[in-house]
Amino acid sequence: MARKKIALIGAGNIGGTLAHLAAQKELGDIVLFDVVEGVPQGKALDLSQCGPVEGFDANIIGTNDYKGIAGADVIIVTAGVARKPGMSRDDLLGINLKVMKAVGEGIRDNAPDAFVICITNPLDAMVWALREFSGLPANKVVGMAGVLDSARFSTFLAWEFGVSIRDVNTFVLGGHGDTMVPVTQYSTVNGIPVPDLVKMGLSTQEKIDAIVQRTRSGGGEIVGLLKTGSAFYAPAASGIAMAEAYLNDQKRILPCAAYVDGEYGVNGLYVGVPVLIGANGVEKVIEIELDDEAKGNLQVSVDAVKELLEACKGIDPSLA
């Protein structure tokens, strides 16, 4: 049986980490693409030389030509720039929209049957634009946000309760930003909902509220510490979890930025919701019942995503 092919668009910190994880897990052969000559080739060569040490047989190549992604089963997109001090949201949107246009056209022309995972920020707008530019079906284009945000939420809760991270299960919905919605009613420690643990006296509502806020600003906290970059280990691990769910038809329920068409009262947007990922991509949007507070918070998040999309349409009229 032919090996699967994983194409990684963008060979920065996340792209390189994605390649390493995909090779370690033997997900398939790997193509690293970047517009900067030498970078994907150099990282591919370096990673290939990990093979004898780590015991993987994945073939890893680097390229500056979109033809190199032809026939990819999974494509993970990290290309674009990070927001820098003094850069407005519209500046970031303008730059990364152009990147998504080039990437979308490259995917459309070379790998139209791929399952595409977008990681580029601002995520909810970029995954929407990428689908528009690529013309792929909505179930085959998804954004990586909720898996990462939920991992951050789970980490902070495990620390607070002093329990194994394996026993913590959380959901973060909504947009990937300050308006995201960590849902405590569906967040559990070995099946026990967080609100019940608070009632038992194992934490306080004030501490849980602080953890919710820390989750919302989780990416910014890491940027503030690193000063010259942003998170890449956990984002890459999150993207790989989504790729595995598709490649291995795992039928996993994961929070992702997915296209919603009526679910949660939302139409025609990409927003963070629980979805079932299997061999057909996003096979189902899972509509869970939310309490009034979570519903209100989700609506605020949806409105923020709508604003981003309107800004995108203003920058590139072809999206209107």
Curated annotation (Swiss-Prot):
Enzyme category, top tier: oxidoreductase
Residues given in the record as substrate binding sites: 83, 89, 121, 152
Domain of life: Bacteria
Keyword Protein biosynthesis found: no
Name the UniProt record assigns to this protein: Malate dehydrogenase
Location of the active site: 176
E.C. designation(s): 1.1.1.37
Record gene name: mdh
Family, as annotated: Belongs to the LDH/MDH superfamily. MDH type 3 family.
Function of the molecule: Catalyzes the reversible oxidation of malate to oxaloacetate.
